[in-house]
Amino acid sequence: MKDLLKIFKSQIKTDEFDAIKIALASPDMIRSWSFGEVKKPETINYRTFKPERDGLFCARIFGPVKDYECLCGKYKRLKHRGVICEKCGVEVTQSKVRRERMGHIELATPIAHIWFLKSLPSRIGLLLDMPLRDIERVLYFESYVIVNEGLTNLEKNQILSEEQYLNALEKFGDEFDAKMGAEAIKLLLNSINLKQECNKLRDELNNSNSETKRKKLTKRIKLLESFIHSNNKPEWMILTVLPILPPDLRPLVPLDGGRFATSDLNDLYRRVINRNNRLKRLLELSAPDIIVRNEKRMLQEAIDALLDNGRRGRAITGSNKRPLKSLADMIKGKQGRFRQNLLGKRVDYSGRSVITVGPYLRLHQCGLPKKMALELFKPFIYGKLEKKGLATTIKAAKKMVEREESIVWDILDEVIHEHPVLLNRAPTLHRLGIQAFEPILIEGKAIQLHPLVCAAYNADFDGDQMAVHVPLTKEAQYEARSLMMSTNNILSPANGEPIIVPSQDVVLGLYYMTRKKINAKGEGMIFKNSKEAEKSYQMGFSELHAEVQVRITEYKKIDKQNFLKNTKIENTTIGRAILWMIVPKGLPFFMVNKILGKKSISKLLNTCYRILGLKSTVNFADQIMYTGFNYAARSGSSVGIDDMEIPKKKSDIISEAEIEVSEIQEQFQSGLVTAGERYNKVIDIWAAANERVSKAMMKNLSTESTTNKQGNEEKQISFNSIFMMADSGARGSAAQIRQLAGMRGLMAKPDGSIIETPITANFREGLNVLQYFISTHGARKGLADTALKTANSGYLTRRLVDVAQDLVVTEDDCNTHKGIIMTSVIEGGDVKESLREKALGRVTAENIIKPYSSDILITRNTLLNEKWCNVLEKYSIDSIKVRSVVHCDTNFGVCANCYGRDLARGNLVNKGEAIGVIAAQSIGEPGTQLTMRTFHIGGAASRAASESSIQVKNSGIIKLHNAKSVINSEGKIVITSRNVELKILDKFRRTKESYKVPYGAIIAKMDEELVNSGEIVAKWDPHTIPVISEVNGYIEFVDMIDGQSITRQTDELTGLTSIVILDTSERTSLGKDLRPALKIVDSNGENVLISGTDMPAQYFLPGKSIVQVDNSIKISSGDTLARIPQESGGTKDITGGLPRVADLFEARRPKELAILAEISGFISFGKDTKGKRRLIITPYNNNTPYEEMIPKWRQLNVFEGERVEKGDVISDGPESPHDILRLRGVQAVTKYIINEVQEVYRLQGVKINDKHIEVIIRQMLRKATIIKSEHSEFLDGEQVEYSRIKVSNRNLSKIGKKTAIFSRDLLGITKASLATESFISAASFQETTRVLTESSVAGKKDELRGLKENVIVGRLIPAGTGYAYHKKRLKNCQKDKTKEKNKPSSISVEEASANLSELLNSTL
């Protein structure tokens, strides 16, 4: 019997599917789903509680309420399976069919589906080419629409009001046909011949020139084509049959007290059925038109509410005044089907508890409370008890476990042995938020966590809770052990550095044991090895910090097994010698023979991992932790109030500052400085005073004097507890110590501005009431900020994950030669990020040639590991071309070589690695550490912004990039080109420093000259832009008429007069069209040409310029003719932190963005309009010039006649990434976004590898717009997936046809997520209704390529171990297909099931 049931069950196993298609349902299809028509609005009988016949819960339509039992009770039990009761008409089967059987309602009149009507752009409106307003008026019975115009002068689709309709009737009689309501729209949709219409529109498109019209036509053609391709019929957007959800999905549950809780859908369905039945009755009675119309309108509204309540008009509310939840609300939003149930399922076999420290654990262990383990592993225990014969049945085993017999604990030990569990701490911001451990049973009720994994979890023990999950199957356990075990996750996937790093106590302990002390007990002793040194310390013969000599044996790794041995006597301390005992063979002694802070310990672990591999590193990390805890306890570090020593100079410094402030106050009152300057100066004074106090304090804290062996006084690093904690990096920082023992300093108001009275007290002295009040200001803002930040950061992560979720490594090599050029990041005089850091773990895109020779140093496609990076440094190579995901040629996914090293493992990335999600997590996870605020520039900052010279830090050679210069009359070099870069190179020609030099700067040294450090190489005036002559000659004024275009001003102090150009707004009507300029002529009055061109040398002057020369005087090249004052833009806010990162990834166009040159050519200015000037760029080959209107208030960087290259900055401002992509290409936009994002993270000290940002950029660039389709299948102006264009163009060029011409688009991450090929992924992200409407009309097919789609349909994801599974599945699919082709036709499914049921019935 059991076997038979098994056979029966195996019959209904679902087939593997490859894709999911969404389309419009035709009325016949809806009827085919249905098991019967619902005719009555009744639900259940109030006395018997049985469902009413033909009602919304009818058992005849939807199936029996109880398993294998008909409604009237005539047939019960399994043996009547499949019988239909002749009395109540119910089929005897399982009651779960009530979850899958649907019903339907035959509507008395067609009804428009609100999604296709109101979800913008309205599909019905687009198809009929009618405005939405008009369609609505027809649908809701306000106007008529002409369905058939006949022989009249009316037009089809024309809207007539009641009055116009009556007039037309009088005039034409029944020549024409006009209707209202959904039936009219249905007739119109029915009458469209899609193919004909489509061809007609294509012809129109080819003949029309207006941009807006073309856009509209393209939209309609796309819609029509999608209907043709998908075999959807337009009239299916109008419902004639309404499907009804299975009743168990909209349940009616009895509550105690005789009341019922019901799903809102039942109310909505009831309204529909009531109105539909009433309408049927009215139609049978042939009631007056106006009544029928009203009923039809009400039915339309009822169905609108059922499908999407509140989309049109007021939402229908229930008895308790809240809007009813419609079908659309069921699937959208955070509580909808997608995000609540499909992507966020709850997990069985899990528990949670508070965490506490387990300092004695090994790295791969965690402490699990016995009580929890017993509950979590129950089924395993039952199984074991039964298998061993200790319990006869499961019930008996259950009793034993409940009684907690002693044998149960032994069994639990066996079960748990080598069965990993997963520990998760919410919020899981990156993949290290879930790791696997082997459980160790402990008493108590708290989970014990290994201290070293706290950093990965971001956990602390102040009441954090964690969840435990049990992997059940063998495969799951194997996966947890091999991939998720904490010992396999030593490196952070974000930057490839160890994340298992000691912190706090451990760091303090190691720091303490590696410190030196002058004249400590046992100084100068010599030991034969570390063991002896430790013994001496334990016996009390010497102190931990004593400087001694120890014989040390170092091992250097040659290959996997062999080491090179080297023994020598080293000067060290006892503590370091003890620490050397736990260091694994293969690491050099110098790494331990120094004071170890947090950074050095991290470096030690990193080196250990790179040289000795995983196993040694894990053991070493554990040993470090035990040793650290041990010696931290012995150090006895504690915080006492006397440890916070206040510097003696403090009061003097503060009183000096107060005197300075009062001086400034006096100047302000006598009117010498403005209020703003006073405020900035006061703040600067206090900031400087605070610096001085804290310097004095740190000097005081960090050193102490002691007597050495010779009896002389000597300074040594202090053993002050607070200083040691900060110095080792265990806890606290100089800034915090400053508040304890220096002065608290300046505080900010909640709006970010600084309060000018600082808090001069520190926490040791205590604050008075005013000081306390001021400090609460900032503190509250901090708390509010944190709350906001968490939400914003979470949303950013969600968008990033969504845009990148389908990127997986799918092949080894795409063989592309493209790549990005890597150089070190240098700003001013300091290297922000070296080439080594940037290139590590990348694959070279071209051979790297040895400098000054033609030998190949590193071949193409080499993975640059630490060894190769040393080679790069040795040959001082400063720029290389490496592969990048942005340029990867793989169609779906990325190849391993373009990605490079898997940062968390340290080798080339494996196929199936979900790099998209990892990138998103790496960028999103530190989001909460970024600031939320925008910075206000003021005080010290604003002065730094206006530098006026370049002083070099290193000696070297000067290199000028794209510099044009002239020599002025004083023999100095003046720069006359824009965006000049000045670099300082060392003797290997490596860039050491890099500066931007503005137009008009005076340079002290020429290209390729030597400079010494500290030399000033360039100077300029930061407040004005000069106009510099490039030729010699005489000045001639053009259009400079006193009172009309210029005015003369006399300076009161010097008595000199100067000519000032009037702004257009200040000129008289006569002077409006004048264009003042300085022209340079030779002695005969002829134009002088700019060298190398045929442009006369004349300089147009913008308003407010100050002219520095007079008419017809002689000038020589390099002289300043005029100065344009720079408007000090006041305090411009810089968007920083999280909002800046979000702006970059959303590719938002900044306000007042930089204007870039669209083409290369010469600049000239045309006729101005009221508020704008006309900029004209004439290309070098005199083709059609490019014109642009620019607002007058924009400061331009270019003068008439200047040459610009495509993409040069014409007017300063923040650059728009879209412009950079259009004018400078993919490479430039990649570089721009990476640098800008890294800038924000660098400020917070967060390290993220560039390749993660590149992964997101690749996803932002995945669409392109077709400019000219040529022979391809695309439309002009259509936006298409870039990979599709690539594939299509490859195929076209193979057969020798013209390929499509396209331009790449940059989409923000939200847009890119919604524009993904997969509609399931897009619908579950945002705007569910719109996505589903669009996809169903187009009959979209989801190939289930991404991770999200597969999670939603409940399959393994195509990444990691699931990647192999899907590959295998596809192989088998193809095999089966070929088999089926060759297989002779066999018995049909129907016959088989008939035979089976016969067999079953005979045996029962």
From Swiss-Prot:
It comes from the Bacteria. GO terms for molecular function: DNA binding; DNA-directed RNA polymerase activity; magnesium ion binding; zinc ion binding. Zn(2+) 1 binds at C70, C72, C85, C88. InterPro entries: DNA-dir_RpoC_beta_prime, DNA-dir_RpoC_beta_prime_bact, RNA_pol_asu, RNA_pol_N, RNA_pol_Rpb1_1, RNA_pol_Rpb1_3, RNA_pol_Rpb1_3_sf, RNA_pol_Rpb1_4. Its cofactor is Mg(2+); Zn(2+). Mg(2+) binds at D460, D462, D464. Its EC number is 2.7.7.6. The RNAP catalytic core consists of 2 alpha, 1 beta, 1 beta' and 1 omega subunit. When a sigma factor is associated with the core the holoenzyme is formed, which can initiate transcription. Belongs to the RNA polymerase beta' chain family. DNA-dependent RNA polymerase catalyzes the transcription of DNA into RNA using the four ribonucleoside triphosphates as substrates. This is DNA-directed RNA polymerase subunit beta'. It comes from Buchnera aphidicola subsp. Baizongia pistaciae (strain Bp).
